[in-house]
Amino acid sequence: MVPVEGVAPSELTDTYHQGRSGGRIHMATDILAMRGTPVLAAAPGRIIKLANGGAGGITIYVADASGRYVQYYAHLMGYAPNVKEGLQVREGDVIGFVGTTGNAPPNTPHLHFQVMRSDANYWNGTPIDVRAFITKPGRMRN
């Protein structure tokens, strides 16, 4: 599922392969949306880390049930009221809101979304280009 309310898979662009400063590759999907748009859990899992600072700004890490994959949500404006570390989330749960924290341009609100194979460290796994796997539009769970 697209992790931003109201965004269809056809609206996603290839930001995964874009170059960044220092010769690095982005290796994530940026999803543009209005500031404050709900950010949704793309898949079920457990929130393992909430962080605020650095390049990602306000961030959420969600591990899947197997512990093999981690979803990373960055540049959030803030967390949903119920969000805390250890919380089990289901696909479509509101977990935060699109923003511009961290190194995001202040006039370009977006969600920086990344899925990683959880290698030695949850925050530094092997990134996966998830666009081929995102087949459902972002819709809040009732």
Region annotations inferred by a language model:
Residues 1-58, 91, 100, 128-142:
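Surface-exposed, glycine-biased beta-strand/turn segments
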Residues 2, 6, 62-64, 123:
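Alpha-helical interaction segments
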Residues 20, 79-80, 117-119:
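Feature marks short, surface-exposed loop/turn motifs that line or immediately flank catalytic pockets
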Residues 42-85, 104, 108-114:
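Zn2+-dependent peptidoglycan hydrolase active-site motif and core
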Residues 61, 69, 87-142:
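Conserved, short, structured surface segments that act as functional micro-motifs
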